[in-house]
């Protein structure tokens, strides 16, 4: 038997029947090929005209170019894939047609004829309702007038089952552009067309009124809902609750919230955030906190908006400890803070003068490259000026000047805070340097800057510079206000007698009535006239300056050893209710409350109180309680570089008074009735206090 060959020539392997050409094969792994692929679920792939194998003249085995430009994928019509392929092909063409229609609509003129021509060209056949919705939604960036004209064309030419759907699409466009008058006009057209509005219509119109700031209109449209047989949903409730709150009708907002709860609506973060905001706006911060705790108790998880709203509310309430708790909870719940979160934290901590916390938030924002505008910077600088954070303020001020954004550069308030900071620490050179820098930056000194500068000069005893700064006020055409006059009065209280006339002249030129009272105070022969003039001054002054005026006048009396006039001022202040609840009495303790008083006012009050105690012992009408206490508060005093507690401790030692600082009650000095009685009896009434 002849042996079979181990291999055959390639030509012997080719089949003898016509085979599918290479051009009809399908290669999905090469989608970038320039060859076009035709998909057919009906036609068989075209047969090549030349089924013979490639000739020797084409050694690479490729087909002629006329046959290699087209690829065909034949899909069996009975295959499950056939319907999907057909839908995909049809959907692609429809999307392209609708996108082209939307583009044409956006490019045409805002006239009825232009819109009609564009849509007729795009839709030779009547479009469906869905086509109309897609085109109107896609063309949402177009002009509102064009959208309304397109709506009218679709209503007249499309196969529309529910006209209200198309109206709602255009109403949402008007809401986005905040066009209230156009919204009302389209509503009227809708009713004339006999179209019944639905819940989505009312929700859109109400939220449009809210977005336009027309909160009374939002409430008005909410009241129309029952007339058309519509019931509000959660979004509508939320929008109207917010509208009631902004309209100042917090009671109606809360009634609506209670109604939503009574009707078993599932509370969501949107409604809760809105109610919290209503409570915060009306000043009911406990109510805001209750809603926040209630939503968590029923399983509604607070989102970022709710947390930010609560942080803002508690910051307004001056409850920084609650702010810290909420922020800690927010971090524990893995809710990612936003820039608004950190702004709320800064607001809360700077207002409450939580220096360390505020600076920590500031540095975090700086590290995260968050935008810090001049308003936030100024809040930080104001806090630093009040609590004496010199190094921190200088760091912030350097950051402001180094900032690249124009919205972060120092303004007049920034310079004012820096001058106030240096003035409070009696750093004259730095205060003057900031003032010069302010002028070079193109800002004129305002009354706050000059007030701080005068206070600084007064602290270091530079009376001539006080007068020079007062002249700057007049040169700039600035009218002195009550705060400025109070500053001059404070400077006068610490000015030596030989230079007092210079400051009194400035006071008289700023406020004639105040200057007259100070002149009578200095004149030792005018006791009765001073009493009447001082009473009239305190009675006619604004409420916020009554106590500062009284404090400074009593300081001046004490420094000039005019105790009779100081007592007259205290009596007038108590009768006018300026000093309220200075003394409190219980069965176990009599207390003197001096917190907020200047040193001179506190010493005068102590003088009067101890004389009253001595009188009680002499008459025997009323025995002393087991405990006597003096509350001075703790920390720095507004009217002195030293705290009132430190001043009083030294003064009580000079008097050899038996009051001692309480170890468990900061700012309190206590004694027993036995020790007080022995000390009072050892002193004559006129010797009780030497001031």
UniProtKB/Swiss-Prot annotation:
Signal peptide, first to last residue: none
Compartments where found: Plastid, Chloroplast stroma
Keyword Transit peptide: yes
Record-level GO BP terms: mRNA processing; positive regulation of translation
Biased composition (Low complexity): 1-17
Region Disordered, residue ranges: 1-76
Biased amino acid composition, Pro residues: 45-56
Domain Smr residue range list: 592-677
Disruption phenotype: Pale green leaf phenotype.
Record-linked Pfam families: PPR (PF01535), PPR_2 (PF13041), PPR_long (PF17177)
UniProt keyword annotations, A-Z: Chloroplast, mRNA processing, Plastid, Repeat, RNA-binding, Transit peptide, Translation regulation
Annotated organelle transit peptide span: 1-35
Its biological purpose: Involved in translation and accumulation of chloroplast ATP synthase subunits. Interacts with the 5'-UTR of the chloroplast bicistronic atpB and atpE mRNA and activates its translation by facilitating ribosome association with the mRNA. Required for accumulation and activity of the chloroplast ATP synthase. Enhances atpA translation and is required for accumulation of specific processed atpF and psaJ transcripts. Required for the stabilization of bicistronic rpl16 and rpl14 mRNAs.
Protein family (similarity comment): Belongs to the PPR family. P subfamily.
Full protein name: Pentatricopeptide repeat-containing protein ATP4, chloroplastic
Gene that encodes it: ATP4
